[in-house]
């Protein structure tokens, strides 16, 4: 009991010693609220902050829709479905592999953006608008290489703009949906080629089971081992990844 009382006195003494120094401390005043813009510059700065916050919020979608991610993840998902292995590989593995391959394929484009736009802007050598113009150009060049003329002509016509004479005349808001449509078309074309051998195995296994009178035995359960052994023997992941990466090199 005496020990507890002594400890209480000790803490009380320390508190009384620290209290004067705490009273002398000054704390910053933080105000969060809406204030009227007194000058056009204040309004412009606030609008720029709002735009940048919106861009940061949409950054994952921008990364997905302006790079090769769409084609990669669709083909990998169709490959998993063709194998008939259920959720193997899991979605995290499919998405992670597609994301890693995206950074690998887009590395030259990202390096060009870093050298021509980001680094000069960080060193205050160019203005913000110049950095944006330089940064978007490598992305536009990449999208143009993968965009089909049919899809581009469709959105140019739907946008009701004058027929572009050069690539620079094509607005980004027209190029972006054209690129996405082209990527989906290419992805499903590759997916069909990948799906076909596994479909043949399913048909053969089903025919054999019907001829043997085993109509109530699920064909997918029998076909799965044959699909897996064929996929491993031909080094399927190597061929698919190799074909996907090379499809962006033109």
Predicted feature locations:
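Hydrophobic alpha-helical segments and their helix-loop boundaries in membrane
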Residues: 22-250
């Amino acid at each position: 009991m005496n020990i507890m009382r002594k400890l209480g006195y000790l803490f009380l003494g320390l508190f009384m010693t620290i209290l004067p120094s705490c009273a002398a401390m000054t704390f910053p005043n933080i105000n969060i609220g809406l204030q009227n813009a007194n000058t056009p510059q204040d309004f412009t700065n606030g609008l720029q902050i709002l735009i940048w916050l919106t861009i940061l919020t949409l950054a994952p979608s921008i990364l997905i829709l302006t790079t090769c991610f769409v084609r990669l993840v669709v083909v990998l998902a169709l490959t998993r479905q063709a194998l008939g292995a259920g959720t193997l590989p899991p979605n995290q593995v499919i998405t992670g592999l597609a994301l890693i391959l995206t950074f690998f394929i887009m590395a030259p484009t990202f390096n060009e953006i870093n050298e021509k736009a980001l680094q000069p802007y960080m060193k205050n050598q160019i203005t913000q608008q110049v950095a944006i113009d330089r940064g978007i150009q490598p992305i536009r060049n990449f999208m143009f290489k993968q965009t089909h003329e049919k899809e581009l002509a469709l959105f140019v016509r739907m946008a009701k703009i004058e027929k572009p004479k050069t690539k620079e005349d094509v607005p980004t808001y027209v190029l972006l949906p054209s690129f996405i449509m082209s990527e989906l078309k290419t992805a499903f074309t590759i997916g069909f080629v990948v799906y076909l051998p596994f479909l043949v195995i399913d048909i053969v296994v089903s025919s054999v089971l019907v001829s043997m009178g085993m109509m109530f035995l699920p064909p997918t359960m029998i076909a799965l081992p044959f699909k897996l052994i064929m996929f491993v023997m031909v080094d399927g992941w190597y061929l698919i990844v190799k074909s996907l990466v090379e499809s962006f090199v033109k």
